[in-house]
Regions:
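SAM cofactor-binding core of SAM-dependent methyltransferases
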Residues: 65-127
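A short glycine-rich, Lys/Arg-flanked "PGG" loop and its adjoining helix->strand segment in the class I
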Residues: 157-171
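A short SAM/SAH-binding and catalytic strip from SAM-dependent methyltransferases
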Residues: 135-155
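Class I S-adenosylmethionine-dependent transferase superfamily signal
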Residues: 138, 165-166, 175, 188
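Conserved beta-strand signature within the Rossmann-like core of class I S-adenosyl-L-methionine
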Residues: 171-179
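Class I S-adenosyl-L-methionine
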Residues: 186-240
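A short acidic, Gly/Pro-enriched loop at the edge of an enzyme's catalytic core
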Residues: 127-137
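S-adenosyl-L-methionine
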Residues: 1-68, 76-83
Length: 240
């Protein structure tokens, strides 16, 4: 299976500025099988024409709170949360095929039915695929911080993204974000504070009424090995 045959190939939807880098990666035979056999069940095909907005109740076969995770990597956090919360439905967006393949294999192994995957740009997913006020939560764990100043425009959390995110969240929804890069943490906190859509961020490590509920991710473990402080907040969506 080559990159042109992959479902939801992100190259088919150009963007002026991407917040991610398309890394080359080889699919294992197991991942190739997962994309061929499991994607039709758990994957969401890329939109065509004007028919892209999804009926999420039809997609999952029920009505339930929905959580979107952007940049799921190999799906560790997404699947851990989905397994612990069978009363919720989980959507994951990832542009790298090996990560999607691994996640599909784990969905099969764990017997999960409350997970669906996009293999396309998450901004496009939010803008084109999801109805307004359809998400109970949005998760963004350890996004690329784009360290160099000339690349800061590529950071995902910018005012237009926050406006889009607020439109897709329910009035009692939340944004759960974590990073190991302090300058990006300051940037995220500043953008959210001035947006008018979110309340003060809650540190799940210091709140008895809130729990992170996510496992240690590969990028977080790397940050810890390098001595980076972990910054994590849950921002409640303010009612309109």
């Amino acid at each position: 299976m080559n990159s042109d045959e992959l479902p939801g190939n992100p190259e088919s939807r150009p963007r002026e500025i991407r917040s991610y880098v398309l890394r080359a990666g080889r699919l294992t035979r197991a991942q190739e099988r997962a994309l061929a056999e499991l994607w039709p069940r758990f994957g969401i095909p890329a939109a065509t024409g004007d028919s892209g907005v999804l009926d999420l109740d039809a997609l999952f076969g029920r009505s339930a709170p929905r959580i979107l995770e952007i940049g799921i990597g190999n799906g560790a956090a997404l699947l851990s949360m989905a397994a612990r919360n069978p009363d919720r439905d989980y959507l994951g967006a990832e542009v790298h095929a090996p990560g999607i393949g691994h996640c599909l294999l784990e969905i099969e192994r764990l017997g999960l039915t409350n997970v669906r995957l996009f293999m396309e740009d998450a901004v496009g997913v939010l803008h084109d695929r999801l109805p307004d006020h359809s998400l109970a939560g949005l998760h963004l764990f350890f996004p690329d911080p784009w360290h160099k100043k000339r690349h800061h425009k590529r950071r995902l959390v910018q005012p237009p993204f926050v406006e889009l995110m607020a439109r897709k969240l329910t009035n009692d929804g939340y944004f759960h974000v974590a990073t190991d890069w302090p300058p990006y943490a300051e940037h995220i906190a500043g953008v959210l504070a001035t947006s008018g859509h979110f309340g003060a961020g809650i540190d799940p490590a210091h709140s008895s009424g809130s729990s992170s509920g996510r496992p240690l991710t590969r990028f977080e473990a790397r940050g810890q090995r390098l001595g980076h402080p972990i910054w994590e907040r849950i921002y409640p969506r303010l009612r309109d």
